[in-house]
């Protein structure tokens, strides 16, 4: 999971 990537967040940014």
Swiss-Prot record:
GO terms for cellular component: extracellular region. It is found in: Secreted. Its main location: secreted. Expressed by the venom gland. Keywords: Calcium channel impairing toxin, Ion channel impairing toxin, Secreted, Toxin. It comes from the Eukaryota. GO terms for molecular function: calcium channel regulator activity; toxin activity. Specific inhibitor of store-operated non-voltage-gated calcium channels. This is Tetrapandin-1. The lineage of its organism: Eukaryota, Metazoa, Ecdysozoa, Arthropoda, Chelicerata.
